[in-house]
């Protein structure tokens, strides 16, 4: 994912979930899809054919799940993000430090959710890579 601290990510180095699944199946046998208990979960889970163990894949680049995502992230600095790949942040820390009312906090949350885009746009030539690494965002 293009959220590395050293900004060394390139699409040419992407190892898709499909390729990883194929390698696992070569080594351990067929993987069987597991039923999703939460349609908004980012991982697609599989069971090993022998019934012992599961593995989950989160493939935002090769298999985006943006349409089902209901996640918000808050950074250690109190900045709210509606997507790991977003460059826009909403300052919830300032509201809390200034004694904001519940209505003001709710309004900020609504603005944040309302600004959520339909997709992350990683494959768009105009995509702007976030400056924060994933671990700095809370992912």
Question: Where is each model-derived feature located?
Answer:
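Radical SAM enzyme [4Fe-4S]-AdoMet core and its adjacent flexible, acidic
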Residues: 1-54, 60, 94
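Short capping micro-motif at the N-terminus of alpha-helices
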Residues: 55-57, 82-83
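Radical SAM enzyme core and accessory elements
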Residues: 63-139
């Amino acid at each position: 994912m293009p959220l590395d601290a050293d900004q060394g990510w390139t699409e040419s180095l992407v190892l898709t979930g499909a390729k990883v699944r194929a390698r696992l199946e070569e080594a351990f046998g067929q993987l069987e899809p597991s039923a999703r208990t939460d349609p908004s979960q980012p991982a697609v889970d599989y069971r090993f054919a022998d019934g012992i163990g599961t593995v989950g894949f989160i493939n935002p680049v090769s298999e985006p799940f943006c349409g089902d995502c209901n996640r918000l992230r808050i950074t250690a600095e109190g900045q709210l993000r509606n997507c790991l790949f977003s460059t826009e942040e909403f300052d919830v820390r300032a509201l809390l430090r200034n004694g904001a009312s519940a209505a003001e906090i709710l309004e900020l949350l609504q603005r944040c959710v309302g600004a959520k885009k339909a997709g992350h746009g990683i494959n768009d030539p105009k995509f702007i890579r976030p400056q924060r690494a994933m671990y700095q965002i809370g992912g």
